[in-house]
UniProtKB/Swiss-Prot annotation:
GO terms for biological process: nitrogen fixation; regulation of DNA-templated transcription; regulation of nitrogen utilization. It comes from Klebsiella pneumoniae. The modification 4-aspartylphosphate is found at D54. One of its GO terms (molecular function) is ATP binding. Keywords: Activator, ATP-binding, Cytoplasm, DNA-binding, Nitrogen fixation, Nucleotide-binding, Phosphoprotein, Repressor, Transcription, Transcription regulation, Two-component regulatory system. Phosphorylated and dephosphorylated by NtrB. This is DNA-binding transcriptional regulator NtrC. Member of the two-component regulatory system NtrB/NtrC, which controls expression of the nitrogen-regulated (ntr) genes in response to nitrogen limitation. Phosphorylated NtrC binds directly to DNA and stimulates the formation of open promoter-sigma54-RNA polymerase complexes. Residues 5-119 form the Response regulatory domain. Residues 140-369 form the Sigma-54 factor interaction domain. Its main location: cytoplasm. Residues 445-464 bind DNA.
């Protein structure tokens, strides 16, 4: 059964022969060409699942061919073959939309694996997704049960102007939820004003919130409206409300009770109609117990509580969020959006993400710029992501997380200049497997050999080689 169609274009007949033989042996249907013009002629009647093109060819070179193919068949993955001296050209190929590049001389198994990835990616693009990704203009993405609860609350409050308190760790998207609450409310056409309590010096918070009269303090040369007046008729979002000083909390409570306030240095009351949405990453109940937050203000704000889960509690959303952020980053940078290899998606879902959705978004921006190929592989992920990926208790590790951790170890070792990684890693891997199998069989060697897929003589030899006799 054919697994896909691969086309090969190279003016070197030996390269064409080697690749055709390897890919045909892997179950692919192959067609070879000597020039880019031959490929373009063939594309008028049929289309492969992947094209491998040399970068240096007489007449039309690989980059010119790539450019024309992307204009006619933008989804067709093109793998550029290049000598080591052509790395600058390979970068240009990525910029023009190459799926990946294959450096010469290449390992034939790696070449087949790369072609397989490209074909899988292409064929997946041809099939409709069960759950279409929200466009980059969509505000909140989430299919996890905890996020569905958030959506239900937003829906139920769509006809209300009641106060809402949003709880969640930093980076979980509290301001996005506040925007959504405003946009789906009767106040949607009125202003949405946001103010971060933690970002304002304490001596300026009152002026920011309530405004000031001319001459109220040094530098107050004109009358200034505060955030409450700016948000009149709409919504005022007070982020990090837990950092609000106690004296300002008292004034805020009065505004919420009376609907009016005085500007700093003013004597005439200012009446406003404002909906308050507050957010914090702190435990406000604990702040109340510690005397750092007014209990009456807490109850005034805590009419409806929305809890935003950390990213580690909604792992099923991570692949979709990552694809969404890759689309946004590509749009911002004016490039084609990167694609995630399935193993990369799995690796992302295993990570701790202490910075939550914001950290994932920044990672996707980084990958859009720094990932080598059009498809993001696990080795493309920044190494610092894995520093928090290993659980304190090894028994908590997911079944296939060892592969990601092994890849990360190899990446660090290579960056440090290590060589002969296989000779270093293989004995440790075999020792671990042997120890585990022998423990599982209570030291019964023949049974341990069977579990490992070895013969008894092989196990005996390994025990001797590894000094485990």
């Amino acid at each position: 059964m054919q697994r896909g169609i691969a086309w090969i274009v190279d003016d070197d007949s030996s390269i064409r022969w080697v690749l055709e033989r390897a890919l045909t042996g892997a179950g692919l249907s192959c067609t070879t060409f000597e020039s880019g013009n031959e490929v373009l002629d063939a594309l008028t009647t049929k289309t492969p699942d992947v094209l491998l093109s040399d970068i240096r060819m007489p007449g039309m070179d690989g980059l010119a061919l790539l450019k024309q193919i992307k204009q006619r068949h933008p989804m067709l993955p093109v793998i550029i073959m290049t000598a080591h001296s052509d790395l600058d050209a390979a970068v240009s190929a990525y910029q023009q939309g190459a799926f990946d590049y294959l450096p010469k001389p290449f390992d034939i198994d790696e070449a087949v694996a790369l072609v397989d990835r490209a074909i899988s990616h292409y064929q997946e693009q041809q099939q409709p997704r069960n759950a279409p990704i929200n466009s980059p203009t969509a505000d909140i993405i989430g299919e996890a049960p905890a996020m569905q609860d958030v959506f239900r609350i937003i829906g139920r409050l769509s006809r209300s102007s009641i106060s809402v308190l949003i709880n969640g760790e930093s980076g979980t998207g509290k301001e996005l939820v506040a925007h959504a609450l405003h946009r789906h409310s009767p106040r949607a056409k009125a202003p949405f004003i946001a103010l971060n309590m933690a970002a304002i010096p304490k001596d300026l918070i009152e002026s920011e919130l309530f405004g000031h009269e001319k001459g109220a303090f040094t530098g107050a040369n004109t009358v200034r409206q505060g955030r409450f007046e700016q948000a009149d008729g709409g919504t005022l979002f007070l982020d990090e409300i837990g950092d609000m000083p106690l004296d300002v909390q008292t004034r805020l409570l009065r505004v919420l009770a009376d609907g009016q306030f005085y500007r700093v240095g003013g004597y005439a009351p200012v009446k406003v109609d404002v909906r308050i949405i507050a957010a914090t990453h702190q435990n406000l109940e604990l702040r109340v117990q510690e005397g750092k937050f007014r209990e009456d203000l807490f109850h005034r704000l805590n009419v409806i509580r929305v809890h935003l889960p950390p990213l580690r509690e909604r792992r099923e959303d991570i692949p979709r969020l990552a694809r969404h952020f890759l689309q946004i980053a590509a749009r911002e940078l004016g490039v084609e959006a990167k694609q995630l290899h399935p193993e990369t998606e799995m690796a992302l879902t295993r990570l701790a993400w202490p910075g939550n959705v914001r950290q994932l978004e920044n990672t996707c921006r980084w990958l859009t710029v720094m990932a080598a190929g059009q498809e993001v592989l696990t080795q493309d992920l920044p190494s610092e992501l894995f520093e928090t990926a290993i659980p304190d208790n090894p028994t908590q590790m997911l079944p296939d997380s060892w592969a990601t951790l092994l890849g990360q170890w190899a990446d660090r070792a290579l960056r440090s200049g290590h060589q002969n990684l296989l000779s270093e890693a293989q004995p440790e891997m075999e020792r671990t497997l042997l120890t585990t199998a022998l423990r599982h069989t209570q030291g019964h060697k023949q049974e341990a050999a069977r579990l490992l897929g070895w013969g008894r003589n092989t196990l005996t030899r390994k025990l001797k080689e590894l000094g485990m006799e």
